[in-house]
């Protein structure tokens, strides 16, 4: 662990406890949670955050929406004049999702542009033979220009280690000079830990939808801090992933993207986990998967390959998680000629060209504090690839070009 990251975690009261909550903090949290529950019951029915785009695929994109009270919701797909072309529900086993606060709508895409809004009505009664509704609300109309897997160019933005500094999302997104951001990757540690659904809405979903997420799909890469807290096991349901896995791969534009889930930084048997984790076997599972996807036809059809993973396994620390990530993934990547591995975690930005240790570029983003924040821009057109590590003020740190 780097000196700066150590100081940051110490200042947050997280060092040495693996982000576990001290006894006093726990009782305070429980008091607040109880207070939140009573508040939620009395608050008005509304969007908890604006709709947000997930899981961009060749034939569809997922629109997620979250509300303050249980409801029945749907997506209206619109034409250029705002006329409803199609109404889309979340359907499973013949039932339209209802009487819940969170929805995922799989929306077919026939081209690059999609215009939509989300509509919902509060459920006031959901009895076996009688369902009643209350107030109906709708979001603003949003127009998203979506990338296609077979298009010749793509531009993507990668952020990391926001650690609940909510204003950083808009600041870094707007500072980026990319004309279009086809995808945004949040490369881990958006949180200190996750205790309630309100953590997700207030610390992530509200700021990212205010900035970009209703029109630019984002990929939530799990960092080691997202694994912590009593809501960590519910975390994934608020996002959408191929095959419902944090680790996944896809081709978008000329780039084949591989997203790894680096897991925790400490050994599985560490006391802070209380016997509840098994990241070593999970990383071995990913290794077997990684060996297959790197040989896939989809990967071979791409001109570039970029790996996004939170914990860097080069130019980092000697903690167990770092070393086990290296043991699982480095040789596989080394033998399959990837272009770059992009990470965060250390809270110290760094750039490393291929050398005797690794034949791919290693980029590590900075930390959450003002003056140490960074963003990474990835641009590709045909056989040309450009990746830049940039300070929050727009000053380039370093980058590389290919083709």
Give the location of each predicted region.
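Acidic, histidine-bearing metal-coordination/catalytic regions of metal-dependent phosphoesterases
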Residues: 2-158, 163, 178, 389-403
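Extended active-site neighborhood of metal-dependent phosphoesterases/phosphodiesterases
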Residues: 118-143, 148, 198-295, 299, ...
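Conserved, compact domain cores that house catalytic/ligand-binding motifs in diverse enzymes
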Residues: 153-227
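Alpha/beta-hydrolase fold active-site loops
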Residues: 154, 182, 247, 254-255, ...
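Active-site neighborhood of phospho(di)ester-bond hydrolases with catalytic His/Asp-centered motifs
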Residues: 158-160, 184-189, 218-224, 306-310, ...
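Short, solvent-exposed loop/turn segments at secondary-structure junctions
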Residues: 194, 315-317, 350
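Short acidic, glycine-rich surface-loop motifs adjacent to enzyme active sites
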Residues: 297-317
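Substrate-binding cleft/loops of secretory-pathway carbohydrate-active enzymes
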Residues: 320-321, 354
